[in-house]
Amino acid sequence: MSEDDTSRQGWTALVLAGARPGDPLAAAEGLAAKHFAEIGGASLIARVLGAIDQTPWIDRVIVAADAATPPEALEGLTSKPLSVVGTADGAPATALAVLNSEAGAPPLVVTTSDNALLTPAILKHFIAAAHDENIDLAVGLADSRTIRSRYPDVQRTYLKFRGGTYSGCNLFAAKTPEAGRVFAFWKQAEALRKSPVKLARLFGVRALFLYVAGLLTLDQAFALASRKLAVKARPILIPYAEAAIDVDKPSDLELARRIAAGKA
C-alpha cells in the first residue's frame, strides 16, 4: 500500500486538552494551560494540530478542552473541520464520552495536547499499523532502546516486560465501539500508571506473578488485558523516539525545545 492509500482515510482525531489545576508547567510559564507554552514560536497544541493537519488519513478533529482553552484560541490551527467539546472527569472519561458520541464514532485516533513532538510520520505509522490489524483498540508504545539511542539522558516511565521495556506515546486508536471498554478501564487504572505492579494486579494473580517474576511479555500482557476486557487490543511499536516525549514539566519543555531546534 502506498503511504497515502485512500483506504486508510476516514479517521477522526481527538486531542485531549483539559488543563490540570495547579499544573507546574503552566504556572512556570504564566499560562492558563501548559499547552500554550511555545516551542519554536508555536504552542504545544498548535504543533499537535499541525501534525494532524498534515496527516491525510485524518478527516476531522475534535479538541476536548475546558474554560482554559476557549474555542477562539484554536482558530486557524487546522484546516480540517474542527469541533470543540467539553471535558469529563479526566482524560479516560473524556475519551469514552467522545467515542460514544456521534462526532467521535470510530475510527478515532486519540492523543494529547502536550504531545508536542508529534509528527505526520508518527501518525501515519501508527494509523497504518492500526488500520491493517483486526482489532478494537491499538496503543502506541516506544521501545526504551529506540528512545535511549536518540536521547540517552531522557527520563521516562517505562513498563518492563520480558524481552523489552516500553514507554507510552499518548497515542490510541479506537477502531470499534468496543474500545470504550478499555477507556473505562483506563479511568480505573490511571492512578496506578506509575506503579506497574499495582497495575498488573488489576489483571489477576497470574498476571501479577508473571510481571513480578519478569516473565510477562508485552504481547502476553495485551492478550491478558484483551481477555479481561473482552476486546481485541494490540500494542503498536513506534520507531520514533520523539513519540514518547510529551511535555509535563519545565524540564520536558526545555528538552522538547532542544529537540525541535536540533540541539539535543
Residue ranges and their predicted role:
Residues 29-48:
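Short catalytic helix/loop segments, enriched in acidic residues and glycine
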Residues 75-108, 117-118, 124-125:
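Short phosphate-binding loop-to-helix
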